[in-house]
UniProtKB/Swiss-Prot annotation:
Catalysed reaction, written as an equation: 3-(2,3-dihydroxyphenyl)propanoate + O2 = (2Z,4E)-2-hydroxy-6-oxonona-2,4-dienedioate + H(+); (2E)-3-(2,3-dihydroxyphenyl)prop-2-enoate + O2 = (2Z,4E,7E)-2-hydroxy-6-oxonona-2,4,7-trienedioate + H(+)
Species this protein is from: Paraburkholderia phymatum (strain DSM 17167 / CIP 108236 / LMG 21445 / STM815) (Burkholderia phymatum)
Pfam families per UniProt: LigB (PF02900)
Protein's recorded name: 2,3-dihydroxyphenylpropionate/2,3-dihydroxicinnamic acid 1,2-dioxygenase
Pathway in which the depicted protein is active: Aromatic compound metabolism; 3-phenylpropanoate degradation
Domain of life: Bacteria
Length: 317
């Protein structure tokens, strides 16, 4: 059965601190066209590769990869909230497939996903509960982190399993590109912040609002040029987009953690979600890909990109 891919940056700042109206309109147009492709494809299963921002995964036990068997969206930054319609048997089968390929993936029967997962589902499918879904968490912010090569191999294992299913499968990669929002690091954290990074589940509304306010303030400073956050790197972003467009997914193995942080910022590690999604698609053979959008958007502290792809045996959608 056919497999279709959509990869897109996400931002929690949309609606809180926006760029010029014409830029917002550009992004929303790209999102609308992507949604139309998904509607036309009419998936029977959605596999979404997504990061987390210390909302669902913490240092009490920080897996590199985790497949949700049951999952709930927490609704941070006014993103969609509520239970996800997880295809449980499929989730467990994908976990078995990953383990059989020597990818040590965890499973969760109480996964909490934040805007990094929920926004992609909402934008691309019209909600978080429209299609059966399997959420796949990829650690992209909490060192030590697995390599891009391991993310690709995770995608490959999941893609080979998905290709054997008699279903139309939509692959989503949510995250990236170059960006470095104000995410704390446990190595330099005081005791209070460290405890939040270790065991910060289900914070009070006041605590969550304070965190969101800090992010908005950081975005305003970044857009004004008054910030120590890592600058956006459009050249790096475009090089990655073009690599994926050419079908050279294995070349992503050469992206080291140190180089990603140095060149694109500490949260650019979210491109692992794209690498995993393209790895899953490439498991079925050569693919045809299109770069749909790219713009560096300082107000969202993000290099904002979008791509779609499908197997070469299918007509281009």
């Amino acid at each position: 059965m056919p497999i279709h891919l959509e990869c897109m940056s996400h931002t929690p700042l949309h609606g809180y601190f926006d760029p010029a109206p014409e830029v917002v309109a550009e992004v929303e147009r790209v999102q609308r066209v992507a949604r139309e492709r998904v509607d036309a494809f009419d998936p029977e299963l959605v596999i979404v590769f997504a990061p987390d921002h210390y909302n669902g995964f913490f240092y009490d036990v920080m897996p590199q990869f985790c497949i949700g068997v049951r999952a709930t969206a927490i609704g941070d930054f006014n993103s969609a909230a509520g239970p996800l319609p997880v295809a449980r048997d499929v989730a467990l089968a994908l976990a078995d497939a990953a383990l059989a390929s020597d990818i040590d993936v965890a499973v969760s029967y109480r996964m909490q996903v934040d805007h990094g997962c929920a926004q992609a589902l909402d934008v691309l499918t019209g909600g978080i509960d429209r299609y059966p879904v399997v959420p796949v968490f990829i650690n992209s912010v909490a060192p030590p982190m697995a390599s891009c090569r391991r993310a690709r191999l995770l995608g490959d294992a999941i893609g080979r399993a998905a290709a054997r299913m008699n279903r139309r499968v939509l692959l989503i990669g949510s995250g990236g590109m170059s960006h470095e929002p104000p995410v704390p690091e446990i190595a330099a954290a005081d005791d209070v912040v460290a405890e939040r990074l270790i065991a910060g589940r289900n914070p009070s509304p006041e605590s969550r609002n304070a965190r969101q306010s800090r992010t908005i303030a950081a975005a305003k400073a970044f857009a004004a040029g008054d910030s120590r956050l890592h600058p956006l790197n459009p050249a790096w972003d475009r090089a990655l987009l073009e690599l994926l467009e050419r079908g050279e997914i294995a070349a992503a193995d050469g992206l080291t953690n140190e180089a990603i942080t140095r060149d694109a910022g500490k949260s650019a590690h979210e491109i692992r979600t794209w690498v995993a999604a393209f790895g899953a698609l490439a498991a079925s053979g050569p693919y045809a890909a299109s770069i749909d959008y790219y713009r560096a958007i300082p107000e969202w502290i993000a290099g904002f990109g979008a791509m779609h792809a499908h197997e070469q045996t299918l007509s281009r959608r």
